[in-house]
A protein has these predicted regions:
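Extended amphipathic ligand-handling, pore-lining, and cofactor/metal-binding catalytic surfaces
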Residues: 1-215
Length: 215
Protein backbone atom coordinates (compact mmCIF):
# COMPACT_ATOMS: atom_id res chain seq x y z
CA UNK A 1 0.00 0.00 0.00
CA UNK A 2 2.81 2.39 0.89
CA UNK A 3 4.49 1.91 -2.48
CA UNK A 4 1.22 2.30 -4.38
CA UNK A 5 0.27 5.40 -2.39
CA UNK A 6 3.65 6.95 -3.11
CA UNK A 7 3.00 6.39 -6.82
CA UNK A 8 -0.36 8.15 -6.69
CA UNK A 9 -2.91 5.39 -6.10
CA UNK A 10 -5.65 6.83 -3.90
CA UNK A 11 -8.29 4.10 -3.72
CA UNK A 12 -7.71 0.80 -1.88
CA UNK A 13 -9.80 -2.25 -1.00
CA UNK A 14 -8.44 -4.78 1.50
CA UNK A 15 -9.76 -8.35 1.03
CA UNK A 16 -9.02 -10.26 4.27
CA UNK A 17 -8.11 -13.94 4.01
CA UNK A 18 -9.26 -14.50 7.59
CA UNK A 19 -12.19 -16.53 8.90
CA UNK A 20 -13.12 -13.92 11.50
CA UNK A 21 -12.56 -10.30 12.43
CA UNK A 22 -8.85 -10.49 13.17
CA UNK A 23 -7.35 -7.61 15.14
CA UNK A 24 -4.57 -7.49 12.55
CA UNK A 25 -7.05 -6.41 9.87
CA UNK A 26 -9.72 -4.44 11.70
CA UNK A 27 -7.62 -2.73 14.39
CA UNK A 28 -3.94 -2.66 13.46
CA UNK A 29 -4.42 -2.11 9.72
CA UNK A 30 -6.50 1.11 9.97
CA UNK A 31 -3.88 2.50 12.35
CA UNK A 32 -1.15 1.61 9.88
CA UNK A 33 -3.11 3.22 7.05
CA UNK A 34 -3.30 6.46 9.03
CA UNK A 35 0.48 6.45 9.32
CA UNK A 36 0.83 5.94 5.56
CA UNK A 37 -1.63 8.77 4.88
CA UNK A 38 0.54 11.12 6.92
CA UNK A 39 3.42 10.27 4.58
CA UNK A 40 1.59 10.14 1.27
CA UNK A 41 -1.58 12.18 1.65
CA UNK A 42 -5.20 11.12 1.94
CA UNK A 43 -6.59 8.10 0.09
CA UNK A 44 -9.81 6.10 0.24
CA UNK A 45 -9.81 2.73 1.99
CA UNK A 46 -12.39 -0.03 2.26
CA UNK A 47 -12.05 -3.32 4.12
CA UNK A 48 -14.16 -6.23 2.86
CA UNK A 49 -15.90 -8.55 5.35
CA UNK A 50 -14.04 -11.60 6.68
CA UNK A 51 -14.91 -15.06 5.38
CA UNK A 52 -17.47 -15.69 8.14
CA UNK A 53 -20.25 -13.29 9.18
CA UNK A 54 -21.35 -14.06 12.74
CA UNK A 55 -24.40 -11.82 12.37
CA UNK A 56 -25.87 -13.87 9.52
CA UNK A 57 -26.83 -17.45 10.39
CA UNK A 58 -27.51 -18.10 6.70
CA UNK A 59 -23.89 -17.26 5.87
CA UNK A 60 -22.79 -20.89 5.64
CA UNK A 61 -20.63 -20.95 2.50
CA UNK A 62 -17.47 -21.65 4.52
CA UNK A 63 -19.23 -24.40 6.49
CA UNK A 64 -20.48 -25.96 3.24
CA UNK A 65 -16.89 -26.14 1.95
CA UNK A 66 -15.70 -27.72 5.19
CA UNK A 67 -18.57 -30.22 4.97
CA UNK A 68 -17.47 -31.17 1.45
CA UNK A 69 -13.95 -31.79 2.74
CA UNK A 70 -15.33 -34.01 5.53
CA UNK A 71 -17.36 -35.99 2.99
CA UNK A 72 -14.22 -36.52 0.92
CA UNK A 73 -12.54 -38.14 3.94
CA UNK A 74 -15.59 -40.30 4.65
CA UNK A 75 -15.70 -41.51 1.06
CA UNK A 76 -11.96 -42.01 0.56
CA UNK A 77 -11.49 -43.92 3.83
CA UNK A 78 -14.87 -45.72 3.65
CA UNK A 79 -15.84 -44.50 7.11
CA UNK A 80 -19.15 -45.37 8.72
CA UNK A 81 -20.67 -42.56 10.78
CA UNK A 82 -17.42 -41.07 12.16
CA UNK A 83 -17.19 -38.27 14.71
CA UNK A 84 -15.94 -34.86 13.62
CA UNK A 85 -14.07 -32.17 15.49
CA UNK A 86 -13.71 -28.75 13.93
CA UNK A 87 -10.22 -27.76 15.05
CA UNK A 88 -8.67 -24.30 14.93
CA UNK A 89 -5.38 -22.90 16.19
CA UNK A 90 -6.72 -21.38 19.41
CA UNK A 91 -6.83 -17.66 20.13
CA UNK A 92 -6.53 -15.08 22.92
CA UNK A 93 -9.59 -13.28 21.48
CA UNK A 94 -13.02 -14.61 22.35
CA UNK A 95 -14.51 -12.99 19.22
CA UNK A 96 -12.27 -15.16 17.05
CA UNK A 97 -13.23 -18.22 19.09
CA UNK A 98 -16.89 -17.45 18.42
CA UNK A 99 -16.20 -18.05 14.73
CA UNK A 100 -15.03 -21.59 15.52
CA UNK A 101 -18.18 -22.33 17.51
CA UNK A 102 -20.44 -20.67 14.92
CA UNK A 103 -19.05 -22.83 12.10
CA UNK A 104 -19.14 -25.97 14.26
CA UNK A 105 -22.88 -25.47 14.81
CA UNK A 106 -23.43 -25.00 11.08
CA UNK A 107 -21.31 -28.05 10.28
CA UNK A 108 -23.31 -30.15 12.73
CA UNK A 109 -26.54 -29.20 10.96
CA UNK A 110 -25.16 -29.82 7.49
CA UNK A 111 -23.70 -33.24 8.40
CA UNK A 112 -26.37 -34.33 10.90
CA UNK A 113 -27.31 -37.46 8.90
CA UNK A 114 -23.75 -38.37 7.90
CA UNK A 115 -21.67 -38.29 11.09
CA UNK A 116 -22.08 -39.26 14.74
CA UNK A 117 -21.43 -35.76 16.08
CA UNK A 118 -19.55 -32.51 15.47
CA UNK A 119 -17.72 -30.69 18.25
CA UNK A 120 -15.25 -27.80 18.16
CA UNK A 121 -11.71 -27.97 19.57
CA UNK A 122 -8.51 -25.92 19.53
CA UNK A 123 -4.93 -26.96 18.91
CA UNK A 124 -3.64 -24.90 21.82
CA UNK A 125 -4.55 -22.20 24.33
CA UNK A 126 -2.76 -19.70 26.50
CA UNK A 127 -2.67 -20.54 30.18
CA UNK A 128 -5.23 -18.94 32.45
CA UNK A 129 -8.95 -19.18 33.10
CA UNK A 130 -9.53 -16.12 30.91
CA UNK A 131 -8.60 -18.26 27.87
CA UNK A 132 -10.71 -21.29 28.80
CA UNK A 133 -13.11 -20.48 25.95
CA UNK A 134 -10.65 -22.35 23.69
CA UNK A 135 -11.53 -25.65 25.37
CA UNK A 136 -11.79 -28.43 24.66
CA UNK A 137 -8.27 -28.74 23.31
CA UNK A 138 -7.71 -31.26 20.53
CA UNK A 139 -5.61 -33.49 22.79
CA UNK A 140 -8.50 -33.54 25.28
CA UNK A 141 -11.25 -34.41 22.84
CA UNK A 142 -9.37 -37.21 21.06
CA UNK A 143 -10.15 -40.45 22.89
CA UNK A 144 -13.03 -38.91 24.87
CA UNK A 145 -16.65 -40.06 24.70
CA UNK A 146 -17.79 -40.41 21.05
CA UNK A 147 -14.24 -39.69 19.88
CA UNK A 148 -12.67 -43.06 20.72
CA UNK A 149 -12.63 -44.58 17.23
CA UNK A 150 -12.90 -42.94 13.79
CA UNK A 151 -12.45 -39.18 14.15
CA UNK A 152 -12.25 -36.68 11.30
CA UNK A 153 -10.48 -33.42 11.99
CA UNK A 154 -12.22 -30.67 10.04
CA UNK A 155 -9.36 -28.22 9.68
CA UNK A 156 -10.28 -24.58 10.32
CA UNK A 157 -7.06 -23.36 8.72
CA UNK A 158 -6.69 -21.36 5.52
CA UNK A 159 -3.51 -23.04 4.30
CA UNK A 160 -0.82 -25.50 5.46
CA UNK A 161 2.09 -24.54 7.65
CA UNK A 162 3.86 -25.72 10.77
CA UNK A 163 0.50 -26.33 12.46
CA UNK A 164 -1.80 -27.78 9.80
CA UNK A 165 0.73 -29.15 7.32
CA UNK A 166 2.00 -32.71 7.08
CA UNK A 167 4.14 -33.51 10.10
CA UNK A 168 2.94 -30.32 11.80
CA UNK A 169 1.73 -29.73 15.34
CA UNK A 170 -1.74 -31.18 14.76
CA UNK A 171 -0.27 -34.28 13.14
CA UNK A 172 1.89 -34.76 16.23
CA UNK A 173 -1.05 -34.32 18.61
CA UNK A 174 -2.97 -36.98 16.68
CA UNK A 175 -0.01 -39.37 16.75
CA UNK A 176 0.36 -38.98 20.53
CA UNK A 177 -3.38 -39.50 21.03
CA UNK A 178 -3.35 -42.69 18.97
CA UNK A 179 -0.60 -44.06 21.22
CA UNK A 180 -2.79 -43.44 24.28
CA UNK A 181 -6.01 -44.77 22.74
CA UNK A 182 -5.50 -47.98 20.77
CA UNK A 183 -8.91 -47.91 19.04
CA UNK A 184 -8.51 -44.32 17.85
CA UNK A 185 -8.13 -43.52 14.15
CA UNK A 186 -7.70 -39.91 13.03
CA UNK A 187 -8.25 -38.41 9.58
CA UNK A 188 -7.42 -34.82 8.65
CA UNK A 189 -9.43 -33.05 5.96
CA UNK A 190 -7.98 -30.85 3.29
CA UNK A 191 -7.78 -27.12 3.97
CA UNK A 192 -10.13 -24.32 2.99
CA UNK A 193 -7.82 -22.85 0.34
CA UNK A 194 -7.50 -26.25 -1.35
CA UNK A 195 -11.21 -26.36 -2.19
CA UNK A 196 -12.25 -24.77 -5.49
CA UNK A 197 -15.21 -23.12 -3.77
CA UNK A 198 -12.89 -20.89 -1.75
CA UNK A 199 -12.46 -18.64 -4.80
CA UNK A 200 -16.23 -18.15 -5.00
CA UNK A 201 -16.35 -17.16 -1.32
CA UNK A 202 -13.54 -14.64 -1.80
CA UNK A 203 -15.23 -13.22 -4.88
CA UNK A 204 -18.45 -12.77 -2.90
CA UNK A 205 -16.58 -10.97 -0.10
CA UNK A 206 -14.84 -8.81 -2.70
CA UNK A 207 -18.18 -7.66 -4.10
CA UNK A 208 -19.48 -7.04 -0.59
CA UNK A 209 -16.35 -5.01 0.12
CA UNK A 210 -17.00 -2.80 -2.89
CA UNK A 211 -20.39 -1.93 -1.39
CA UNK A 212 -19.04 -1.04 2.06
CA UNK A 213 -18.40 2.47 3.35
CA UNK A 214 -14.93 4.00 3.30
CA UNK A 215 -13.20 3.92 6.67
Amino acid sequence: VLEKAKNGTNDFLILPLFFGRSAAIYEYLPQRMEEIQKQCGQFDLKIAPPLVDLDDSNNDDVAQILADLVREEISYNKLDFPSVTLVDHGTPRIKVNEVRNFIAEQLALILKDEVQCVKPSSMESREGEEYSFNKPLLEEILGSSKFERDVILSMLFISPGRHAGKGGDIDKICAESRKKHSALNTFMTGLFSEHEGSIDVLNKRLNQGLETEFI
